[in-house]
Curated annotation (Swiss-Prot):
GO cellular component: 9+0 non-motile cilium; membrane
Biased composition (Acidic residues): 29-53
Start and end residues of each stretch annotated as Disordered: 1-95
Keywords: Membrane, Transmembrane, Transmembrane helix
Official protein name in the record: Required for drug-induced death protein 1
Domain of life from the UniProt record: Eukaryota
Length: 140
């Protein structure tokens, strides 16, 4: 038996579903109320028996403008416990140390390359004139 045939037979054996894709049980009042409300929205909007307010919606239907407010307690208690004070300081110190090392390396390499560049510029400038150039090696 192929996969498609198995799925077809399984789908045909399933219990029929309601109009909204949910199983409807007899006596389920909440589901019945929701379905009746949703099916009621499918009515003809131009029907005579629906009373409308001045903004174009049915009387008694909730609108998006209605705001529900809830009273908050006097004192707010956070759900998360604050972290101890010494941990961020250690982490911050480690980051500063790491960045300091990297900046120090960049400056020393940059200084070395600047000295090499200046020596090359001096050699190129003085070479046409036949003046001997002394190259001083830059050692840290």
């Amino acid at each position: 038996m192929t996969v498609g045939a198995r799925l077809r037979s399984k789908a045909s054996s399933l219990v029929g579903r309601g109009p909204l894709g949910r199983l409807r049980r007899a006596g389920d009042e909440e589901t019945d109320a929701i379905v009746e409300h949703l099916e009621g929205e499918d009515e003809d909007p131009e029907s005579q028996d629906c009373e409308r307010e001045e903004d174009g919606r049915r009387a008694g239907t909730p609108s998006a403008r209605r705001v529900h407010l809830a009273a908050l307690p006097e004192r707010y208690d956070s759900l998360e416990e604050p972290a101890p004070g010494d941990k961020p300081k250690k982490r911050y110190r480690r980051k500063l140390k790491k960045y300091g090392k990297n900046v120090g390396k960049a400056i020393s390499k940059g200084c070395r390359y600047i000295v090499i560049g200046l020596q090359g510029f001096a050699a190129a400038y003085s070479a046409p004139f036949g003046v001997a150039t002394s190259v001083v090696s830059f050692v840290r």
